[in-house]
Regions:
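Hydrophobic helix-and-loop "lid/oligomerization" segment in the mid-to-C-terminal part
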Residues: 9-166
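Short amphipathic alpha-helical face segments that pack within enzyme cores
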Residues: 2-3, 7
Length: 166
């Protein structure tokens, strides 16, 4: 993505590619790219130094993941506390949930005030990015529940077919 953005910058005589290094780092970390490659290391470190994307920033700062001013999140923070939530939305989220997450990544939409869908907050307003963080958490919990349900089925099959006796 970054290479494509730098190419567009060249064609259009602009300089916007650097603005997306945070998303480049998120993608590289989420895809578990080989960090022995110096170019990959560079993109990850530069992206983590300058997290600008509203949703990415909100996910880093949610639920006790608060960083002091100037503190840089670590790769493991993103790998364990951000990427799995986005992955869950992509895998088991509804179209509406995916749209909320996508729009929360857009600077011009992320901080729009919308009616809250949070339980007990009827009639209140919240930002799209706040709602998106809650939606991502809800979807991740739903994915965990699905995994737990399937594990029960798998364990039953293993027991019924004596598959541990091999």
């Amino acid at each position: 993505m970054y290479k494509f953005c730098t190419y567009l910058d060249e064609l259009l005589h602009t300089s916007h590619a650097e603005d997306f290094l945070d998303l480049v780092s998120l993608g590289l970390i989420a895809d578990v790219m080989d960090t022995r490659d110096f170019e990959t290391q560079y993109y990850i470190q530069e992206g983590l130094k300058h997290v600008r994307n509203p949703f990415y920033l909100a996910m880093i700062n949610k639920d006790g993941m608060h960083f002091k001013s100037g503190e840089i999140p670590l790769m493991n923070d993103v790998a364990w506390y951000v990427a799995p939530f986005i992955n869950a939305v992509n895998r088991v989220g509804t179209v509406e949930e995916k749209i909320i997450i996508f729009e929360a990544m857009l600077d011009f939409k992320a901080y729009t005030q919308i009616p809250s869908t949070k339980r007990g907050c009827k009639g209140m307003m919240e930002t799209l990015v706040e709602q998106a963080c809650r939606v991502a958490t809800k979807v991740k919990n739903r994915q965990n529940d699905l995994v737990d349900e399937l594990l029960v089925v798998v364990e039953k099959i293993i027991k019924e077919q004596n598959l541990l006796d091999n």
